[in-house]
């Protein structure tokens, strides 16, 4: 708000000083200043830019500068510019006016090589570029948002001369809003030497095994369909020895004239899209029908896929996709750069029944162990992704879901460094399958003072004490419930184990 008030204050002072009693004109300009000052902060700053076309002197006809007719084609414009620019380049031509002529050539080529600017010039003449050689940008006039609006006031005069004392309102408002005045200096940017067209990317879904996702894979052959240049016309879209002809609608001007409501209006020719030339149907290539490209459904490419891939990853193969869907005349190929799009390989990783990947570089494996191994400790065998088997020790008292790490056995990070392999223990508790197993579990519960465990066997009160009939009956009924019967070998082995266990506990060294 302070910014707007300052602008209005400065503008009002200048108006009062120079306008004097021309109160009517002063009011009109003041209202314009209020309107533009109110909208100026909302205008995107990027729209205020300095044009590449600069000429502080009188605006020169770009066609005359390049020695061309208005019907000149793009190739003729480019050829004429290169020829004259080489002749008058300041590094080659040491004549005093060579640099000025070189800049005139740049300005002319800047207009005629751009379809939009050329159309504006053909339609409006020098007025399309501010009348003084400065091309109108998005904000109009050399970086000032008020350039085009106040430019016409510079020529306002009365019987006693200009009531504004020669004030240029474009310069005034341009300075107030940080822009340069009309015709302000600035380095010219070099013109684009060619146009670029890039083909569409192609996405391929490729499945890989878990092992290949971890370690990568070489010489993978991918099949896909893509656009290629027509093999008959080499991408021109035309038969050999044929060329575009002048447009029958606009007669080579690229524009059409319409009269509406007494006003003459010009628009881009709908037949040639402003090019001024067109292809005759009989000149179209018989293979691609004038498109310049053809579909190749049997393309293949051999690639190496990197290690450490995960499901959903995309591998980009640059410059191997489709050719641009555009036909380019043979004489314009030097001014057009065509490049293929990319191939995007979307990875789908087959699930492995044993392994999974977490944290990008760690391979996880779940290992089931019985409760006895978890309690007493032991040794287990673990498979690896490579197909090998390794043996690791289980610590006594291992808990459910406890994880151990095996260093440098995970997903490769570099050629020498890998992540870890994580082994997670799953303790399996099985239901007793025989009377012997049940007796041992109950004995363990009794020894460990487990009051919560269900017990059907009651220990004797002393060695040699007879077991009452009721207990024996219950034991027999429990035994009959088990489908698996204890054979003599099992019972003998159990007897020996218990006997040896008692001897070890009591310290008896007898065999």
UniProtKB/Swiss-Prot annotation:
On the tree of life, the source organism's domain of life is Eukaryota
GO CC terms in record: cytoplasm; mitochondrial matrix; mitochondrion
Q: Where are the CXXCXGXG motif repeats?
A: 230-237, 247-254, 269-276, 285-292
The organelle targeting sequence, given as a residue range? 1-55
Keyword check for NAD, yes or no. no
Q: Where is the J domain?
A: 59-127
Its predominant location is mitochondrion
The subcellular location is: Mitochondrion
- UniProt cross-references to PROSITE patterns, sorted A to Z: DNAJ_1, DNAJ_2, ZF_CR
Q: Give residue ranges of zinc fingers (CR-type).
A: 217-297
UniProt keyword list: Chaperone, Metal-binding, Mitochondrion, Repeat, Stress response, Transit peptide, Zinc, Zinc-finger
Alphabetically, the GO molecular function entries are: ATP binding; ATPase activator activity; heat shock protein binding; unfolded protein binding; zinc ion binding
Its BP terms in the Gene Ontology are: 'de novo' protein folding; chaperone cofactor-dependent protein refolding; mitochondrial genome maintenance; protein quality control for misfolded or incompletely synthesized proteins; protein refolding; response to heat
- What function is annotated for this protein? Plays a role in mitochondrial biogenesis and protein folding.
Q: What else is known?
A: Present with 7570 molecules/cell in log phase SD medium.
Name the HAMAP family on file: DnaJ
Name under which the protein is recorded: DnaJ homolog 1, mitochondrial
What organism is listed for this UniProt entry? Answer: Saccharomyces cerevisiae (strain ATCC 204508 / S288c)
Gene name of the record: MDJ1
